């Protein structure tokens, strides 16, 4: 009789110890998952909300999807714009909201082994720059996507900056403005200009630039002298009268 009672109590104690161990294991798993990334075992969930300013969620959520690391994990949006992607192990993931009508910036989410979530912007240019984001995610649209490049409008600056036009206009401006800037009455200056232009004119089939410059300057000087003589003649005739 005593042996049976002892066996009964031993079995009862064994069952109670197993129940206590199972409750401790379940409590440790629930404490280790942590925060908003609660999951079963080593699996967690990413949750957030997508917003398009000035547009109701019902007008665009039907064609939108939530992608985690491409198409490794896919989630759907609820009627209020919120989403939850389940069964995600610990690691770093890029979360994107894909919509044909609106553009959303991707977000990187880091999940620790204890279930802690850290979110930040994805910067492909400056990878070392870290901009923290609140969690759960609040993903706001930056506007409609631009699938086409606008055609550039034609302007006068495009015509003037054309290399062919500049090649024709610049020499003309030089020949017109240079005689006005340089003192053509100085023979030494004229001689130096003729020599420099002859050095550039290496092809003998082309017209001589020095002759052109001499004719240009001589014609202007002759015009000045003729105008001066005509003025003196008129003044002399007036005095005689």
Swiss-Prot record:
One of its GO terms (molecular function) is carbohydrate binding. One of its GO terms (cellular component) is endoplasmic reticulum membrane. Residues 1-22 form the signal peptide. Residues 23-158 are lumenal. Keywords: Endoplasmic reticulum, Membrane, Signal, Transmembrane, Transmembrane helix. Residues 217-241 are annotated as: Disordered. GO terms for biological process: protein insertion into ER membrane by stop-transfer membrane-anchor sequence; tail-anchored membrane protein insertion into ER membrane. Residues 180-241 are cytoplasmic. It is a single-pass type I membrane protein. The keyword Nucleotidyltransferase does not apply. Residues 218-234 have a biased composition (Low complexity). The chain crosses the membrane at residues 159-179. The keyword DNA-binding does not apply. It holds the Pfam family EMC7_beta-sandw. It is found in: Endoplasmic reticulum membrane. Component of the ER membrane protein complex (EMC). Belongs to the EMC7 family. Part of the endoplasmic reticulum membrane protein complex (EMC) that enables the energy-independent insertion into endoplasmic reticulum membranes of newly synthesized membrane proteins. Preferentially accommodates proteins with transmembrane domains that are weakly hydrophobic or contain destabilizing features such as charged and aromatic residues. Involved in the cotranslational insertion of multi-pass membrane proteins in which stop-transfer membrane-anchor sequences become ER membrane spanning helices. This is Endoplasmic reticulum membrane protein complex subunit 7. It comes from Bos taurus.
